[in-house]
Every structure is written in structure tokens, then in C-alpha cells.
Regions:
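Flavin-dependent oxidoreductase catalytic cores
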Residues: 1-316
Length: 316
């Protein structure tokens, strides 16, 4: 299955210019894409999410919203915490996006509940400082996720597969750890989701925990419009955003703990660059694997793995 990422469920959920956001007028173009994927014999999925505070007024057309009010240095911008009465409509936006995905010919949706985006911002004690029923205890912090999943599963019905990408760890002190994220996974299992994609990291606080390797400071700052932020990141970025060494299957140790406790299908992602390691991961009981960078490096890598037992991507 080929998954298209990332598509915002509302305009306020856009994190970059020219990003997809789900609305009726883009359905015909997406249908062309899914028709092409299906013609090649594959299934098509689309990742749906809302970036929360990871945006800017110049991108999303409004003051960015999040689990709590504050200032996000990553954007950089002030952020308005969503009111409790706004949350049901935000959850319904996820459901509407599932319906649009169906119209566009997608076979599956992947709900993005990780990496410090909106659902993740509600889940993490680092970004959720609310004093109402959506903040404080883990049970409260999961309420918005529960609301979203109710709308998603209702819209998905019996003909759309629903995967959820979630964090096993946020990747920094004060973020979510396994004791809480295992509970999140069990709640998602109860929600009726069909599979979990196990990831980790927080784009605004621990981006290289997600991707591993050295932070591409020059490439990242090239696209920054704010001159003082660009200068600051180039000067102190490598200390503010430390590198995290890359190794093959870098999330496997944590993912195996989920495999032991969670009965539903699990998808492994993170550092897969060889057929040998993919076979090893699948032998550990994961129903599927997900790749991104290896396929950007070599779009035909999956086809080559069919032919070569020792196939390895040039991606590092």
C-alpha cells in the first residue's frame, strides 16, 4: 500500500505551504492519483491530521491553535488553546475527511496521532497544560483522541481501513513514555482502529528522534522566512536540536514491548533499509512495515527486494 502524507483535516491544520487539506474541490485530483495506484495493483492510503501549534498565520490563515495557549518557537508564533466547545467540530473534521478520502478512492486512512501534532499535543503532558476535562490525567488527555476516533470509525464504516500513527515515546524529558503510551495503544484498540503504526518523536522538541542522524541545519533554515530565527538556528541549532545516531530498526526495542502487550495488528516503522532487517521485523510478529526515506532514495526498492535477498537501500 502507498500512503499519501500529510493531508490536513482543516485549513488551520496546514503546517507548510502547498500542503494538502481535505475539501471537496481536491477530490478529482486525488482520484486520479488513486486510480493510478490501483492500476499498478496496489492499495492507496492517505494520512489525515492536524498540526496544531506547528503552523503560522501566513500558512494557515489564522492564529495557530493547539491543546494549550503559548508560544511555539518552532514556527515561531503565539498559539491559541482550543476551547472545549470547539473540540467536537474539530473531531467531526476528521470524520468528514475520511468520507472525502473514500470519494477520492482511497482504501485506507492513517490518523496522525504522533510526532507532536494536534492529537499528540493533547496526549503529551509537555504540551497539554489544560485545567479542564481535557487536561491533567492521562484519561483526560485522551478525551480528544477518543472524540476523534469516534467520528473516524463512524465515517469509515465497513469499507475503509483505519490505521493510527502514534508515539511510543515523545523522545525528550517531560514527554510521554511507555507506561502511558501503552495505555494509549490499548485505548485505540478499544476504539476499533484496525492497526497501529508505532513511531516516536516530537517535531518541535525532538525532531531527530523521529528520523535519526544529523540535523540538516542548512537545508532546514533555507526555507525559514524569519531572519532572526534562521540566524539563531544556524548559530545554535546543533545544540538546541541534538543529533540522534541512526541504526537499523531503531524503534524495534520499544515496538517489541508493544507487540507483547497489544493484540491488534501493528505496523513497524523506523530505520528499515534492507530486506534482511525487514524479514527479521516481520518474523517478530508485526503484520506490516512502513518505509519512507528508503523509498525516496530508491523508489523501486520494494521491487528490487523481491528479486534480491540481500537488497539494501543506499539510504543511511
Amino acid at each position: 500500500m502507498t500512503t499519501v502524507a500529510y493531508a490536513a483535516v482543516t485549513q488551520s491544520g496546514l503546517s507548510f505551504d502547498r500542503q494538502l487539506w481535505m475539501r471537496p474541490e481536491i477530490v478529482p485530483g486525488l482520484r486520479e492519483l488513486t486510480d493510478a495506484v490501483h492500476k499498478e495493483g496496489a492499495a492507496a492510503g492517505i494520512q489525515l491530521g492536524h498540526c496544531g501549534n506547528m503552523s503560522h498565520k501566513s500558512i494557515c490563515g489564522c492564529m495557530p491553535v493547539g491543546a494549550s495557549s503559548g508560544f511555539n518557537l518552532y514556527s515561531p508564533t503565539f498559539v491559541r488553546g482550543l476551547r472545549a466547545d470547539e473540540l467536537p467540530e474539530m473531531a467531526r473534521a476528521y470524520g468528514r475527511s475520511v468520507n472525502l478520502a473514500r470519494e477520492a478512492g482511497f482504501d485506507a486512512v492513517e490518523i496522525h496521532a504522533g510526532h507532536g501534532y494536534l492529537i499528540s499535543q493533547f496526549l503529551s503532558p509537555s504540551t497539554n497544560h489544560r485545567k479542564d476535562e481535557y487536561g491533567g490525567s492521562l484519561q483526560n488527555r485522551m478525551r480528544f483522541m477518543d472524540m476523534v476516533m469516534e467520528e473516524v470509525m463512524k465515517a469509515a464504516g465497513n469499507d475503509m481501513a483505519v490505521l493510527v500513527k502514534m508515539n511510543m515515546r515523545d523522545g525528550f524529558k517531560g514527554g510521554m513514555e511507555l507506561d502511558e503510551t501503552l495505555q494509549v495503544a490499548k485505548r485505540l484498540e478499544q476504539s476499533g482502529a484496525h492497526a497501529l503504526v508505532l513511531s516516536g518523536g516530537f517535531v518541535s522538541k525532538a525532531p531527530m528522534y523521529v528520523m535519526r542522524g544529523e540535523m540538516p541545519i542548512r537545508s532546514m533554515t533555507h526555507y525559514m522566512d524569519c531572519w532572526w530565527l534562521k540566524y539563531g538556528v544556524r548559530m545554535v541549532g546543533k545544540w538546541m536540536i541534538p543529533s540522534v545516531p541512526f541504526k537499523e530498526a531503531y524503534f524495534l526495542e520499544d515496538a517489541l514491548k508493544f507487540r507483547k502487550e497489544i493484540k491488534m495488528p501493528l505496523v513497524y516503522v523506523g530505520g528499515l533499509v534492507s530486506r534482511e532487517k525487514i524479514d527479521e521485523v516481520l518474523d517478530c510478529g508485526f503484520e506490516a512495515v512502513q518505509m519512507a526515506r528508503a523509498l525516496l532514495n530508491e523508489p523501486g526498492f520494494v521491487n528490487r527486494m523481491r528479486e534480491e535477498e540481500n537488497a539494501r537501500s543506499g539510504c543511511k
